[in-house]
Amino acid sequence: MQRIDDVNEIINFQHIAKNIKPDPGEIPSVHGLDIYGETLSLLGDVCGDHIIYVDFSKRFNLDERIKRTELTDQIEVSNKLKELKNKSGILLSDVSGHSITDSLLNAMLHQAFLVGASYELSNYGEITADLFETINNRFYQSSSIDKFITMIYGEIQNNGDFRFISAGHPLPLIFSNEYNKIVNIDNLSLVNFPPIGMLPSESDIDGKFAKSILGYKKRYSVNTLNVMGSGDILILFTDGFSEQKDGQMNYVAERLEEQLKISKHLPAKEIFYDVKKDFMNYCGSPDDDATMILIKKN
């Protein structure tokens, strides 16, 4: 009987995970950009990687928010809400550990982010770094030091500007169509913070209540990249693409650029499937979830 109960619990957990897994229809639509991404999961819908697509006009009632802010003379908030119609957000996370229950942290992050985003849009007209300070602090207080989440959240505008915060996550890559290679962005002084839940936030109003022998995390700052040229590709990914077989196989370093040279003329979805096929040929049977999101400038 215990085994049957365990199987039923796993099935129930699969159902919960499926409800927060992004539908293909949620992929943002931004004028001048072609966006596509998927997770290659080891355990079906239950996964240590997670994507939240934020097409602001689909996720939130921007027009009603704009109307309400204009009625109360919140002109700055109204203007920021209008700007959201020309951009979309993407959150990509990766939970430490490979057990089924580890993915519960992604479900917690999913709900915390969307609830917080709704509040911030209504009050500030934008998603601010303060939301992630609060999320980080709550995760620190409710999970152990070995249970954390790497995360990147960014917003892409129709002109190709990508502004993002990274918490222990692999930094984005840019493939240049003109130079036919992944360009070096190391000289841009991009900032990568500790993973979500590893250190309390020194700037969060409640952060000092959290005791930490390792100290406190500095306030999040926002990085900026620009996908300038026609055909350029911005690449977001989890470490499943760079660390397979206990870190012995790195697809990003060894194969990704060559595959993009071959497939760069295709739409983002077809490029992704070419990369996926090459990745599976490269590593055989993956031992970690792997996620990649491609943003191609038309």
What are these regions (language model features)?
Residues I100, L104:
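Catalytic Zn2+-binding segment of zinc metalloproteases
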